[in-house]
């Protein structure tokens, strides 16, 4: 089993557990160049989203694939979710280690007011 398959299996297990709970989830995806975050309802409707691929976020940054960029995405997605009335979410790390950019995004979202 390769690295990607292992990550996807971990992600599937976590998503099934969050689905059983029936709460909104903050989903994180990362690539070498960008970081993406979405708040998704139990009915699989995207309520809020932010990424370093967006001009509004990326023009504040020097480089989009680092911890500082992830912090900016976390803060932005939290602000947008709170505007929509979502304050409590479950954190879905998509099988990625809770380290580096993923942890930075989570911490920034918490500081901006999301609870998880």
From Swiss-Prot:
Pfam families under this entry?
A: Ribosomal_L18p
Keyword DNA-binding annotated: no
Query: Which keywords label this protein?
Result: Ribonucleoprotein, Ribosomal protein, RNA-binding, rRNA-binding
CDD domains, per this entry?
Answer: Ribosomal_L18_L5e
Drop me one GO molecular function for this one: structural constituent of ribosome
Entry-linked InterPro entries: Ribosomal_uL18_bac-type (IPR004389), Ribosomal_uL18_bac/euk (IPR005484)
Does the record bear Cell inner membrane in its keywords? Answer: no
Alphabetical GO biological process terms: translation
Return the SUPFAM superfamilies for the record.
Translational machinery components
Q: Name one GO cellular component term.
A: cytosolic large ribosomal subunit
Purpose: This is one of the proteins that bind and probably mediate the attachment of the 5S RNA into the large ribosomal subunit, where it forms part of the central protuberance.
Subunit info?
Answer: Part of the 50S ribosomal subunit; part of the 5S rRNA/L5/L18/L25 subcomplex. Contacts the 5S and 23S rRNAs.
The family assignment reads: Belongs to the universal ribosomal protein uL18 family.
Would you tell me the protein name for this molecule?
A: Large ribosomal subunit protein uL18
Question: Species name for this entry?
Answer: Shewanella piezotolerans (strain WP3 / JCM 13877)
Q: Which gene encodes it?
A: rplR
């Amino acid at each position: 089993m390769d690295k990607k398959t292992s990550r996807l299996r971990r992600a599937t297990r976590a998503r099934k557990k969050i689905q059983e709970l029936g709460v909104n989830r903050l989903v994180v995806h990362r690539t070498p160049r960008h970081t993406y975050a979405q708040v998704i309802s139990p009915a699989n409707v995207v309520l809020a989203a932010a990424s370093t691929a967006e001009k509004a976020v990326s023009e504040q940054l020097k480089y989009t694939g680092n911890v500082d960029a992830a912090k900016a995405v976390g803060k932005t997605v939290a602000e947008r979710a709170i505007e929509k009335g979502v304050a409590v979410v479950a954190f879905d790390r998509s099988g990625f280690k809770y380290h580096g950019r993923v942890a930075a995004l989570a911490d920034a979202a918490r500081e901006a007011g999301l609870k998880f």
